Amino acid sequence: MAVPQLYYFTIRGFGEYIRLLFLDNGIKFEDIRFDYEGNEWQEFKKGMLLGQLPCLKVDGQEIVQTGAIMRHLGRVHGLNGSNEQEATFLDMFFEGVRDVRMKYVRYIYYDEGTREDCVNKTIPEALVKLEELFKAHSGDFIIGNKISYADYILFEELDVYHVLDANILDKFPTLKSFWERMWKRPNLNAYLEKRKADKVWINAIEKGMN
């Protein structure tokens, strides 16, 4: 199998879930990053299926849409649960996390509500539901003690919210413990520490970095 190529921007954004999955599982990949406003991206965009990123190219196939990429990698690398029931639960959890992300996006890019609203109401109200859903399976991860593709989006989004407010996870001990465990994973820790030190932007604008 050829080394997969991941195309995304120089920010964390939606591409970061995919990077984390590759890194944590020791899967070699090319991490190709475009400047959001650069000419290189504008030219590359013209030849793409839907004209958007992230894009994963593997064995001649171009896969776009974040969810499609993550589920593909989940199936290929044994990160999609052990049966249809678990796979469906992961699907549900993944989409639930993305719904929370879109609430955050509306604050970041469209100034919907204040930072205080986002930190004290919008995100916490959603995390209450995710905390309960996480508890449906006992163990360190979403479906027990085996990591899945959905754990990477959950971790990244929790980290994004923690950057926004360092205390935001304190009322959600199960999710906070999960977030702390993920930070300590051997294949992720050095990358995460460097990302933090380099202050890699989460979004296409600086908003959300403090």
Swiss-Prot record:
Pfam families (UniProt xref): GST_C_3, GST_N
Tissues expressed in: Expressed in cells at the mouth and adjacent to the pharyngeal bulbs of the head and also in the tail.
Enzyme nomenclature, EC number: 2.5.1.18
Catalyses which reaction(s): RX + glutathione = an S-substituted glutathione + a halide anion + H(+)
Keyword annotations: Transferase
Gene3D superfamilies: 1.20.1050.10, Glutaredoxin
Single Gene Ontology MF annotation: glutathione transferase activity
Segments traversing the membrane: none
InterPro entries noted in UniProt: Glutathione-S-Trfase_C-like, Glutathione-S-Trfase_C_sf, Glutathione_S-Trfase_N, GST_C, GST_superfamily, Thioredoxin-like_sf
Residue ranges annotated for the GST C-terminal domain, each copy included: 83-200
Biological-process GO terms, alphabetical: determination of adult lifespan; glutathione metabolic process; heat acclimation; response to hydrogen peroxide; response to UV-C
Class of enzymatic activity (EC top level): transferase
UniProt family annotation: Belongs to the GST superfamily. Pi family.
Role: Conjugation of reduced glutathione to a wide number of exogenous and endogenous hydrophobic electrophiles. Responsible for approximately one-third of 4-hydroxy-2-nonenal conjugation. May play a role in the detoxification of reactive oxygen species produced during pathogenic bacterial infection.
Identification of the protein by name: Glutathione S-transferase P 10
Species annotation: Caenorhabditis elegans
Gene behind the chain: gst-10
